[in-house]
């Protein structure tokens, strides 16, 4: 088993069968020791968050697969905090796609002169390039096409999937009395189709209860009835 990529919250290994293995770590993105899924660097470590993120991911991947939505998920080993996935090809050097229901985080930092904190957004989708040196810059569908990263048809498919998946996650957590403010995904290309890759983890979403943000570990416990 060969390590092919070292990420902020996961390491990636190539398996003999051609698939990949994701090893979840106890690191989360944030700043000054405060959790923030919108940051592009590791801000703190939380004991057990790697397994927690994996458990949450497995729950949602199985929901999506049952709904007929294509993902890279194959299987998981909770004890080892690993997940086997299909070898999907990333777009460019990687894209992150954010779906927003409320104005918080980097959206508020960018557009705070035009919108109040917590204002409702209608399943707003935006994409960023994975580029730590440039702080994960925003990019439009036209920009992605001009740079030969993604076609307009692929972008449209990705956007539609993002909204569909986000609504499934939103409705699922609403059953626990929780509200999804925003969530981050990654997509890849496999068998000529755009599919969801990476994870659907507590550390990749902002969830609130009674107007207060829910800690990722607490969120996992609520979602998994622990």
Each language-model region and where it sits:
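Active-site loop/lid in soluble adenylation, ligation, and acyl-transfer enzymes
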Residues: 1-129
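Coil-to-beta-strand transition motifs
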Residues: 19, 92-94, 177-180, 191
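Short histidine-centered catalytic/ligand-binding loop motif
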Residues: 37-52, 134-161
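A short glycine-rich, hydrophobically flanked beta-strand micro-motif that places a catalytic Asp/Glu
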Residues: 72-79, 174-189
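Conserved metal-phosphate-binding beta-hairpin within the catalytic cores
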Residues: 99, 180-199
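C-terminal helix-cap and adjacent tail motif
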Residues: 109, 114, 200-226
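Phosphate-binding core of ATP-grasp and ATP-grasp-like enzymes
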Residues: 123-135, 166-179, 202-205
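A long amphipathic alpha-helix within ATP-dependent nucleotide-binding catalytic cores
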Residues: 149-181
């Amino acid at each position: 088993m060969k390590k092919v990529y070292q990420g902020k919250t996961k390491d990636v290994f190539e398996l003999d069968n051609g698939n990949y293995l994701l090893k979840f770590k106890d690191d989360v993105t944030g700043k000054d020791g405060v959790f923030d899924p919108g940051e592009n660097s590791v801000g703190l470590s939380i004991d057990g968050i790697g397994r927690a993120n994996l458990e949450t991911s497995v729950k949602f991947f199985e929901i999506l697969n049952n709904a007929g939505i294509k993902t890279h998920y194959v299987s998981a080993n909770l004890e080892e905090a690993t997940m086997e996935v299909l070898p999907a090809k990333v777009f460019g050097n990687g894209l992150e796609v954010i779906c927003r229901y409320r104005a918080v985080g980097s959206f508020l930092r960018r557009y705070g002169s035009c919108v109040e904190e917590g204002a409702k957004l209608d399943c707003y989708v935006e994409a960023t390039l994975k580029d730590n040196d440039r702080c994960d810059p925003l990019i439009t569908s036209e920009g992605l096409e001009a740079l030969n990263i993604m076609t307009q048809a692929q972008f449209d498919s990705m956007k539609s999937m993002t909204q569909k998946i986000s609504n499934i996650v939103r409705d699922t957590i609403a059953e626990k009395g929780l509200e999804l403010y925003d969530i981050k995904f990654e997509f890849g290309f496999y068998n000529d189709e755009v599919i969801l890759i990476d994870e659907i983890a507590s550390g990749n979403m902002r969830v609130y209860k009674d107007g207060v943000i829910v800690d990722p570990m607490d969120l996992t416990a609520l979602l998994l009835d622990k």
